[in-house]
Design a protein with these regions (language model features):
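Short, small/polar residue-rich loop motifs at catalytic or cofactor-binding pockets
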Residues: 40-43
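Short, electropositive alpha-helical surface patch
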Residues: 25-38
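Short acidic/histidine-rich active-site segments
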Residues: 58
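Short, acidic, Ser/Thr-enriched surface-loop or helix-capping motifs
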Residues: 50
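C-terminal accessory region of radical SAM enzymes
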Residues: 1-28, 61-107
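Radical SAM enzyme core and accessory elements
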Residues: 10, 63-64, 72, 77, ...
């Protein structure tokens, strides 16, 4: 409400996460934010190369390795081939947990088309790649924001709609 009011009073201020969600809701265009796509972008939209040549599915996976969790390490450029890392069983397995259409509580969620499921985040926060939606903080946050955005869109308020579209352009 505060950010909407700022915009109504003439201060252009974009709420970044809401803008990403609105782009998913109001347009056919991708956001480029790999956490809000299905499958999630881990290992397929980008990877992280570490100083020692290790290749991780995401920066979060690289950070987990700092705590001795190497599960999301695809290999090492000095030891493994491209095929081994990017067409190997590990990446295929990880991606199988990155599709909201296949995950419990995501596949039948009304907001599923606007979300993503990050197996790295789930492993880090909940101990497995699926995660448990009722206690998943990212899920709770995203669903509550999407619900709020739909409430505002449902009002058909021309001023709010103008603000939302200004965030997308």
């Amino acid at each position: 409400d505060y950010i909407i009011e700022l915009n109504k009073k003439g201060t252009f201020f974009v709420e970044g996460f809401a803008a990403l969600l609105l782009r998913r809701i109001l347009t056919p265009f991708a956001t480029g934010f790999v956490d809000l796509q299905s499958p999630a972008g881990v290992g397929i939209a980008g990877v992280i190369y570490d100083y020692d040549g290790s290749v991780y599915v995401s920066d979060e996976a690289r950070m987990m390795a700092r705590f001795k969790n190497y599960y999301f390490r695809l290999g090492n450029v000095n030891e493994n081939s491209y095929q081994e890392m990017f067409n190997g069983e590990l990446l295929h397995h990880i991606i199988s947990f990155a599709c909201t259409e296949c995950l419990p509580a995501c596949s039948d969620c009304v907001f599923q088309p606007y979300c993503g499921a990050d197996p790295v985040r789930n492993m880090s926060e909940q101990g497995d790649m699926v995660g448990f939606r009722p206690t998943n903080e990212m899920c709770k946050k995203t669903k509550s924001i999407i619900h709020y955005l739909f409430e505002l869109l449902h009002k058909h308020d021309p001023e709010i709609n103008r603000i939302f579209w200004s965030w997308l352009n």
